[in-house]
Amino acid sequence: MALPILLDCDPGHDDAIAIVLALASPELDVKAITSSAGNQTPEKTLRNVLRMLTLLNRTDIPVAGGAVKPLMRELIIADNVHGESGLDGPALPEPAFAPQNCTAVELMAKTLRESAEPVTIVSTGPQTNVALLLNSHPELHSKIARIVIMGGAMGLGNWTPAAEFNIYVDPEAAEIVFQSGIPVVMAGLDVTHKAQIHVEDTERFRAIGNPVSTIVAELLDFFLEYHKDEKWGFVGAPLHDPCTIAWLLKPELFTSVERWVGVETQGKYTQGMTVVDYYYLTGNKPNATVMVDVDRQGFVDLLADRLKFYA
């Protein structure tokens, strides 16, 4: 039986490719997709979900827009990474359908209530929508199997020296998620920076030759340009968000550890930092499965294989 998942995202090039991977995988049953502000403004990220589902001919999936700003802060967006639209590069179709007439949290709650089995929440943007769901619907916590997030880092940040972007946008929300008591799986920069797509991988995807693989290659063409900056020291572009979906499909591609994770919300230099108790120094029981390594070639092969689904 396919694993029921609820995807909360802020497309974003890598979010878009996570959607592509999830919907090409019969092992997963995508019950709904909600959008959050983050990589772009809330209006643009919602539109990008609708555009991607139109491209993939999956207008049957319920979609709802989420919080327009973090719980306690002003919104920060990553338009320098993802462009004016949030998905700059390819020519994507206009949305062929409308979102549900409800909020992201309402759609999430409805999805959980109606599911016969616990649902896995996959969150690849700021954690605002998920935190609002957890705070407003404690009676539904038992309907959540786990929360798989792209966010955080044990080591270096990518938005500040200490913080990864998704967590930095709304650290208070991320702290709610990590301390919720629900199993959390963290795909942080320690693993996603190893999940790099090289130019030759992009050409491999393009050569598959279907409309979706072509769009994915064009998304990566744009994403690769930003990551050419020598400060990163990358060979290619880190494909952050699809690591969450790949972990659900093939966890054997990843190395992970069980550790306690907290989020710094006050520090002068460290706001948004995910504090991972790697050496068990706090005495706190582990609350997260933290990915630390990936079989890069296996990850690329998985994506290439699933892109053939769209032939």
Swiss-Prot record:
CDD domains xrefs: nuc_hydro_IU_UC_XIUA (cd02651)
Cystine pairings recorded for this chain: none
Keywords: Glycosidase, Hydrolase
Pfam assignment, any one: IU_nuc_hydro
Protein's GO biological process: nucleobase-containing small molecule interconversion; purine nucleoside catabolic process; pyrimidine nucleobase metabolic process
GO function term, MF aspect, one: uridine nucleosidase activity
Top-level taxonomic group: Bacteria
EC number(s) reported in the record: 3.2.-.-
Gene Ontology CC terms: cytosol
NCBIfam families the record matches: PRK10443.1
UniProt similarity note: Belongs to the IUNH family. RihA subfamily.
Protein name: Pyrimidine-specific ribonucleoside hydrolase RihA
Lineage start: Bacteria, Pseudomonadati, Pseudomonadota, Gammaproteobacteria, Enterobacterales
